[in-house]
Curated annotation (Swiss-Prot):
UniProt GO cellular component terms: extracellular exosome; extracellular space; plasma membrane; side of membrane
Gene (name only): SMPDL3B
Disulfide bonds: C45-C64, C405-C409, C415-C428
Pfam families: ASMase_C (PF19272), Metallophos (PF00149)
Protein name as catalogued: Acid sphingomyelinase-like phosphodiesterase 3b
Organism: Homo sapiens
InterPro entries: ASM-like_Pdiesterase_prd (IPR017064), ASM_C (IPR045473), ASMase/PPN1_MPP (IPR041805), Calcineurin-like_PHP_ApaH (IPR004843), Metallo-depent_PP-like (IPR029052)
Cofactor note text: Binds 2 Zn(2+) ions per subunit.
Length: 455
């Protein structure tokens, strides 16, 4: 009997041993196909709008979206740094920040196809889990809750990465679920179309559950729990608020509430959440009713260096970034996060791009891993220690902004990271003595038809 118990123990111990793996996360590539180095500052890039771009370099400019040279360099840098990842997360926003009339459906599809071919060329044997961003549609932001030509065409483009079931789902609503590769077979990737919940999407504003995605997510997470699987949730637009200004929520309030309700209900099977959209480097914490951290949401910085036009944002540009996660293949627990970047000014001055380590999460913040508990510790240190806050603030812009994060800045960032719930976020700002800024400028922009360019 003792021998049998010992054999069972050994079997369980062997099954629970760590299986270290790595995966890439890239976001917000925003190719500007018309970028060119020009002596005329008004002829450099359409994505700069009416702003002059003096002294533009071959690798890009902070007022512009990515030239092809920058995107090409970023994907090949991934291959050089970690050539055999288990998989790649690619969370969308591929087209430039230009008005709809300067783009069109054919141009959107052409850009997505061009980037897809590049990634497949550099990583021919790597599974890619790709999501659409709010700019990956025409007209931008206006994602329908049902089938359409763009969903159909992109599903065909991504066919080598998708199962037959995922292709059918993608054509209906641009979301899907895939089993993770690897020997354990105990993990799933859920790719969401969170553009359906975006405040700028007028098509879904009055819907309770666009595309039935919430119900589908409930079903997938329930099934994962029964099967003993862990899940990564992936999307473009995150819930909660932008940290570089006040009171800018991305989801409509009802959708934000529903998403948080689903995640809190199923948090035991959710090993990580991964989003983009911000172009900045940040994270969000979710807590249960007792205040215990239950999930961390990682917002990956963009490849594009483009300076946001969102009202209230100061120094809204960033250096280009790519990110690799270290994880346990058996449990999907996140062990570390390493961000690499290109100093764009330096690359243009030297004529050669150099992708270098910006920081490693565990070393930068002195935590053992990237679990929800550890990220809660990181947030507490950011909120309570000025030097840690300042370090985070530099990382937030991918080492672009060297300015000081003062008290008002600190509250904007900390409240956004700590409170993803809309009412709790507002309470956090008031409790800090900061009066939330009304969204009148955004309303005026919407009336003027300009809101499509801000992110």
């Amino acid at each position: 009997m003792r021998l049998l118990a010992w054999l069972i123990f050994l079997a369980n111990w062997g099954g629970a041993r760590a299986e270290p793996g790595k995966f890439w996360h890239i976001a917000d590539l925003h190719l500007d196909p018309d970028y060119k180095v020009s002596k005329d500052p008004f002829q450099v890039c359409p994505s700069a709008g009416s702003q002059p771009v003096p002294d533009a370099g071959p690798w890009g400019d902070y007022l512009c979206d990515s030239p092809w040279a920058l995107i090409n360099s970023s994907i090949y840098a991934m291959k050089e740094i970690e050539p055999e990842p288990d998989f790649i997360l690619w969370t969308g926003d591929d087209t430039p920040h230009v008005p709809d009339e300067k783009l069109g459906e054919a141009a959107v599809l052409e850009i997505v196809e061009r980037l897809t071919k590049l990634i497949r060329e550099v990583f021919p044997d790597t599974k890619v889990y790709a999501a659409l961003g709010n700019h990956d549609f025409h007209p931008k932001n206006q994602f329908p809750a049902g089938s359409n030509n763009i969903y159909n065409q992109i599903a065909e483009l991504w066919k080598p990465w998708l199962s037959n079931e995922s292709i059918a789902l993608f054509k209906k609503g641009a979301f899907y679920c895939e089993k993770l590769p690897g020997p354990s077979g105990a993990g799933r990737i859920v790719v969401l179309n969170t553009n359906l919940y975006y405040t700028s999407n007028a098509l879904t504003a009055d819907m309770a559950d666009p595309g039935q995605q919430f119900q589908w997510l409930e079903d997938v997470l329930t099934d994962a729990s029964k099967a003993g699987d862990m899940v990564y949730i992936v999307g473009h637009v995150p819930p909660g608020f932008f940290e570089k200004t006040q009171n800018k929520a991305w989801f409509r309030e009802g959708f934000n509430e529903k998403y948080l309700k689903v995640v809190r209900k199923h948090h035991r099977v959710i090993a990580g959440q991964f989003f983009g959209h911000h172009h900045t480097d940040s994270f969000r914490m979710l807590y249960d009713d007792a205040g215990v951290p239950i999930s961390a949401m990682f917002i990956t910085p963009g490849v594009t260096p483009w300076k946001t036009t969102l009202p209230g944002v100061v120094n809204g540009a960033n250096n280009p970034a790519i990110r690799v996660f270290e994880y346990d293949r058996a449990t999907l627990s996140l062990k570390d996060m390493v961000t690499y970047f290109m100093n764009l000014s330096q690359a243009n001055a030297q004529g050669t791009p150099r992708w270098e380590l910006e920081y490693q999460l565990t070393e930068a913040y002195g935590v053992p891993d990237a679990s929800a508990h550890s990220m809660h510790t990181v947030l507490d240190r950011i909120a309570g220690d000025q030097s840690t806050l300042q370090r985070y603030y530099v990382y937030n812009s991918v080492s672009y902004s060297a300015g000081v994060c003062d008290e008002a800045c600190s509250m904007q960032h900390v409240c956004a990271m700590r409170q993803v719930d809309i009412d709790a976020y507002t309470t956090c700002l008031y409790a800090s003595g900061t009066t939330p800024v009304p969204q009148l400028p955004l309303l005026l922009m919407a009336l003027l038809g300009l809101c499509t360019l801000v992110l």
